[in-house]
Amino acid sequence: MAKKVTGMIKLQLPAGKATPAPPVGPALGQHGVNIMGFCKEFNAKTADKAGLIIPVVITVYQDRSFSFILKTPPAAVLIKKELGLESGSGVPNRTKVGNITKEQIRKIAELKMPDLNAATIETAMSMIEGTARSMGVVVVE
């Protein structure tokens, strides 16, 4: 018989650096999940992705066990990593912070493809381009 789901928790955590401190502790504690167990498992699975923010969806079951699914990092994080930026522009319509090429966008789109609601790589690329523009990054050919 399948386990009964009692909760779904969505978090964005730095890869390999989950600790029982907020936001992890309070989010999992209210569902009665073993916080250290989650932190150890998450850190082990994301150790190779250091420096990235990893979204995770945690499913909590009635017997207080859990399972989690790792998603791909947000597009904005991947764009900042690709261009070596600290942050995007506060006023993207006036201040531009960098340039990104179509090849770099294709690389990010291919990485994000499993989590994007896009049928083709071209639509995924246009989504990533929109994110880049809203960060103050100019898309060049």
From Swiss-Prot:
Provide any one GO MF term from the record.
Answer: structural constituent of ribosome
Keyword annotations? Methylation, Ribonucleoprotein, Ribosomal protein, RNA-binding, rRNA-binding
Among the record's GO biological process terms, what is one?
translation
Using the record for this protein, list the coiled-coil segments as residue ranges, or answer none: none
Q: Which domain of life is it from?
A: Bacteria
Q: How does it assemble?
A: Part of the ribosomal stalk of the 50S ribosomal subunit. Interacts with L10 and the large rRNA to form the base of the stalk. L10 forms an elongated spine to which L12 dimers bind in a sequential fashion forming a multimeric L10(L12)X complex.
Protein name per UniProt: Large ribosomal subunit protein uL11
What is the organism of origin for this protein?
A: Clostridium perfringens (strain 13 / Type A)
Q: Which gene encodes it?
A: rplK
